[in-house]
């Protein structure tokens, strides 16, 4: 198979370390790197095929997890951060020089407000939670991927043990529905 889903997936998954304490993420600039410190491991780490997430060059998917907002702090070169799309629900903070997305934060009322979206692959520390599933898989078609190649994409995910969804995982979709029902007074 010639396609690259993501470097952390293409050759099989590396299991994370239980109780992993977190670490630092760095942009790709050769010097004066943005540094973001994460005070815990990520949760719900997954491959994402949406058109908004940052992806390594040549990859069809990003790998992104969430972490409580209070566990995220910018610890160097915050002046280089810029918001990619100020109208998006997830405010993706990227390096204004190299373009790497450092973290995404939700400021509006949303089921995931209080969680930041991060790419643990930007860390030089090993042990982060491995991807757990693949989300928004069909969305790569909207970005120009040929529909007839989707069986190969799904088979490649399945070969490394990842279930594929065209939304989020059932647990995350349940969390969204629960939040919505509570806000509507149904729960």
UniProtKB/Swiss-Prot annotation:
Residues binding Zn(2+) 1: 27, 29, 95, 98
Signal sequence residues: none
Catalytic reaction annotation: S-(hydroxymethyl)glutathione = glutathione + formaldehyde
The protein's Enzyme Commission number: 4.4.1.22
Cofactor entry: Zn(2+)
Alphabetical list of HAMAP family matching this protein: Formald_GSH
One of the GO biological process terms: formaldehyde catabolic process
Keyword Zinc among record annotations: yes
Cited PANTHER family: CENP-V_GFA DOMAIN-CONTAINING PROTEIN-RELATED (PTHR33337:SF40), GFA DOMAIN-CONTAINING PROTEIN (PTHR33337)
Boundaries of every CENP-V/GFA domain copy: 20-166
Family under the similarity heading: Belongs to the Gfa family.
UniProt pathway: One-carbon metabolism; formaldehyde degradation; formate from formaldehyde (glutathione route): step 1/3
Residues that, per the record, bind Zn(2+) 2: 48, 50, 53
InterPro entries reported in the protein's UniProt record: CENP-V/GFA, Formald_GSH, Mss4-like_sf
Name of the protein this chain belongs to: Putative glutathione-dependent formaldehyde-activating enzyme
Organism: Talaromyces marneffei (strain ATCC 18224 / CBS 334.59 / QM 7333)
Annotated function: Catalyzes the condensation of formaldehyde and glutathione to S-hydroxymethylglutathione.
Record keyword Lyase present: yes
């Amino acid at each position: 198979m010639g396609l690259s889903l993501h470097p952390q997936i293409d050759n099989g998954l590396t299991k994370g370390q239980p109780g992993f304490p977190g670490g630092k993420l760095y942009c790709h600039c050769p010097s004066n790197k943005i540094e973001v410190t994460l005070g815990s491991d990520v949760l719900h780490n997954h491959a994402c095929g949406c058109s908004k997430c940052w992806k390594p060059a040549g990859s069809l998917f990003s790998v992104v997890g969430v972490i409580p907002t209070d566990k995220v702090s910018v610890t160097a070169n915050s002046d280089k951060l810029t918001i990619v799309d100020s109208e998006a629900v997830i405010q993706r903070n990227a390096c204004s020089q190299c373009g790497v997305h450092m973290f995404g934060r939700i400021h509006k009322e949303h089921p995931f407000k209080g969680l930041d979206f991060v790419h643990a692959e930007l860390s030089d520390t090993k042990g982060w939670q491995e991807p757990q599933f693949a989300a928004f898989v069909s969305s790569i078609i909207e970005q120009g991927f040929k529909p007839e190649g989707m069986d190969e994409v799904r088979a490649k995910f399945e070969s490394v043990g990842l279930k594929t969804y065209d939304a989020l995982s059932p647990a995350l979709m349940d969390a969204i529905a629960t939040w919505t029902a509570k806000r509507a007074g149904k729960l």
